[in-house]
Amino acid sequence: MAKGKKLSFSFHTYQDSVTGTEVVRLTPPDVICHRNYFYQKCFSNDGSKLLFGGAFDGPWNYYLLDLKTQQATQLTEGTGDNTFGGFLSPDDDALYYVKNVRNLMRVDLNTLEETNIYQVPDDWVGYGTWVANSDCTKMVGIEIKKEDWKPLTDWKKFQEFYFTNPCCRLIRIDLKTGEATTILKENQWLGHPIYRPGDDNTVAFCHEGPHDLVDARMWFINEDGSNMRKVKEHAPGESCTHEFWVPNGSALAYVSYLKGSTNRFICSVDPVTLENRQLTEMPPCSHLMSNYDGTLMVGDGCNAPVDVKDDGGYKIENDPFLYVFNMKTGKHFQVAQHNTSWEVLEGDRQVTHPHPSFTPDDKHILFTSDVDGKPALYLAKVPDSVWQ
C-alpha cells in the first residue's frame, strides 16, 4: 500500500468481564498493530487522532487514526520503519521516525512529504528510541558501532549482547541543520536517552542490559557532555527499570524491585537534588507512565521479568490487569484486563507489550494487547472512582 491510502475500521466496544470497565478495540485483530513507545507522543493535542504502527501490507508502517471517523491514513511505506520510536511533533504537523536504523525522517502530515534530517554514519547503527526536546528543535539518540551491533530478536540475544560491551555513543541532533554532536561515548551498552521536559541541559540515559546485572541503570548528563551523575545507587539485589520523565519535567519516575521479593515500588528522583523517593508499593507492573503532572500513573500487570539473567529469583504470578494509581490519595485501581501474551512476535520483543499511557484528557488508557489474535490497540475508560 502507498502513503495516503485510507483504511476504514469498525471499533469494537465491550465491558471488561471482571471490572465492568468499558474497553474499545480500535484496530482489527487479524493484522499486527501496536502503539509507539509509551513516553513518545502518539495523540494529537486535542486527542482526536492517534499515531500507531501497523502491518496492513506486510511491512510495519506508520498510520494516523482519526478516532471520530474511525479511518486511518497511511503515513509511511516500504520496509525498515522503527514503528516504536516515532512521535508526533508538538504542533501536530509532523511525524519523526527512524528508517532502516540509519535515517532520521520527518513526514509532513499535510503533504506526506518526507525529509531526511540526519543519516547515521556508515560505521554506526541507530539504536532504540530517539527523543526530542520539548520544543522539538533537537533530539537525543544512541548509536552503536556497526561492527559491535547484533539484531536483538529475542530475550536470549538481549542478555548475550550485554556481555559484548558494545561501543556506544549518546548523540544530540539539531533538527534544523541535521548536525550531530557526541555527548558521551563508552564501551558499554547505552539506551533510553530522554531530554528532561523544559530543560534541554539535562539528559537522562541508561546503562542497558539484564536488570539484575546492571550495577547502576539510570544516569543524568548535561547536554554538553559535562556533569555526568549517577541517579541512584542500587541497593543489594535491587533492579530499577522503565524510567521516564513526568511530562512536566518535575521528576524522573521508575520501577524498583528486589530479588527474592514479589513487591514492586513506584519511585522518583528529583533531577536537581538527586533525592530518590519511594512513592508507593504497587502490584507487579512492568511499564509505568504518568499523566502530565504526575498525579496519576498507569501500569501493566505482568509475569516474571524476562530481562534478567537469574530469573529464578523473580518468580511472580501473572497479573493480567491494567492499574491506575492516584498519587495524591495513595489508592490504586484495577481498571481492566489487558490479557496480553507478552510473547516475542516476528522477531520483535515488545510488540505484544501493553505500554499503557493516558489520553490527553486523562479519561482513557491506550494499550496494546494480542488477546483477540494479533496485537491490536485498545482504549480502556478510566473509572470515575479514580478521582474520588
Curated annotation (Swiss-Prot):
Pathway listed: Glycan metabolism; pectin degradation; 2-dehydro-3-deoxy-D-gluconate from pectin: step 3/5
UniProt-recorded Gene Ontology molecular function terms: oligogalacturonide lyase activity
Reactions it catalyzes: 4-(4-deoxy-alpha-D-galact-4-enuronosyl)-D-galacturonate = 2 5-dehydro-4-deoxy-D-glucuronate
Any single GO CC term annotated in Swiss-Prot or TrEMBL for this entry: periplasmic space
Leader peptide range in chain numbering: none
This enzyme's EC code(s): 4.2.2.6
Enzyme class: lyase
Gene3D superfamilies: YVTN repeat-like/Quinoprotein amine dehydrogenase
S-S pairs: none
Biological process annotations from GO: pectin catabolic process
One Pfam assignment: Pectate_lyase22
Stored InterPro entries: Ogl_dom, WD40/YVTN_repeat-like_dom_sf
Upregulating conditions: By galacturonate and polygalacturonate, and subjected to catabolite repression.
Main location: periplasm
Physiological role: Involved in degradation of pectin, which causes soft-rod disease in plants.
Protein name (record): Oligogalacturonate lyase
Organism of origin: Dickeya dadantii (strain 3937) (Erwinia chrysanthemi (strain 3937))
